[in-house]
């Protein structure tokens, strides 16, 4: 007997829905989804009646298009070039269609007013664009909790504990570099991007979770790849209507991978947390001072003061923030130095003198002024994002020049001032001594340091919207580069130009980046 096609179709739909309900029983019924979809349409109609931005949209939807998909894809592919082209000639804001909707991008001249506006929320951006309400995005759920525990730990503990972790961090970096880069004294081509990424992953995790997990290959794999999986899944979900995302994320392979990584991270971390808590309770019961560990597990416990927090989510968020941004600046800094070989010996002399006399301390890292200047210049020439400090408007916002941003829309600041010839002489030129000279001026010495921010250099954002982990990243990068420059000779691979990976707001060193290297007969 032949079964009608429509009957088969209905059965398949029923089976598919049953499978979804089995794996996600909390999902709403089909009737609820239809009702929700109609409500969404109604809300969209009501929202469209509100005041709109009168700014020009650079990549508008064509009149015949039903969706903004083409515009979003074109922004993903062309955003850095578009933003640079517009703001190099115009000191006026502009609107774009990005993967999460409309985004008003402001010129850097408006950054000072922007950064002070409490109506513009970075946490809202992180929670919305990285789907903090969905399983697998547990790191962003912890980041956006009202307690803001992660921000407190990064801003307070990573600063006050620097004297305790700098030397252990240097020792870990030294051993890791020997393991990854080896002792080959012949010139050879090295996949420097991949090797530096592994180096950063291992040194970051050493401070984040301590010695035991920092040498656990399974944890290192999660730390290294979870951020990539999360970024891919977040981007894919942003292309779907909001109401469908709670369903779609259960059906996509990246979503399953993301949730598996979180589950395994919990399984690896939880025994260590419980062991330390039991150890502390036992010591206190015996009137003994509990041991204190120099890692962020300890600092989260101290800062939480007994209040619940998601320990695994916190650590995954720290890895997301601390590995790839740090790697990009470190690799970019190394490549720029190698592209200007006359820099290598002055840098080695500085490292020998400072570290040789004072050892590994926060104070000695501060004195690596040429290395600091090189890194800040690398960040100026190639910022990691072409527009930064993204935030959502919690209410309608009007800037002093009349620029209007509707409630619920995204706002960012272009990095145009970092390449403005009126601010920086010869802005296209990599000048490694640029910020070293500025440090000689008492009025500019503070902002000329890598870890400090101002309106002329927003590579780390601008306080209070600056990257809170920049102080730790600065120390870590200097330690790693000091070892790499002293231990190895470097040169460019012939006929292999430097490449960047440009996608949406990001401008990053290409993963295929390679350099030539060989071991030297010197060490720190």
Swiss-Prot record:
Residues 48-524 are lumenal. Pathway: Polyketide biosynthesis; lovastatin biosynthesis. Residues 1-25 are cytoplasmic. Its main location: endoplasmic reticulum. It holds the Pfam family p450. It is found in: Endoplasmic reticulum membrane. One of its GO terms (cellular component) is endoplasmic reticulum membrane. Cytochrome P450 monooxygenase; part of the gene cluster that mediates the biosynthesis of monakolin K, also known as lovastatin, and which acts as a potent competitive inhibitor of HMG-CoA reductase. Monakolin K biosynthesis is performed in two stages. The first stage is catalyzed by the nonaketide synthase mokA, which belongs to type I polyketide synthases and catalyzes the iterative nine-step formation of the polyketide. It is a single-pass type II membrane protein. It catalyses: dihydromonacolin L carboxylate + reduced [NADPH--hemoprotein reductase] + O2 = monacolin L carboxylate + oxidized [NADPH--hemoprotein reductase] + 2 H2O + H(+); monacolin L carboxylate + reduced [NADPH--hemoprotein reductase] + O2 = monacolin J carboxylate + oxidized [NADPH--hemoprotein reductase] + H2O + H(+). The chain crosses the membrane at residues 26-47. Monacoline K acts as an inhibitor of HMG-CoA reductase involved in cholesterogenesis. Its hypocholesterolemic activity might be useful for lowering cholesterol levels in the blood and reduce artherosclerosis and coronary heart disease. It comes from Monascus pilosus (Red mold). Keywords: Endoplasmic reticulum, Glycoprotein, Heme, Iron, Membrane, Metal-binding, Monooxygenase, Oxidoreductase, Signal-anchor, Transmembrane, Transmembrane helix. Belongs to the cytochrome P450 family. This is Dihydromonacolin L monooxygenase mokC. The lineage of its organism: Eukaryota, Fungi, Dikarya, Ascomycota, Pezizomycotina. Binds 1 heme group per subunit. Glycans are attached at residues 396, 401. Its cofactor is heme.
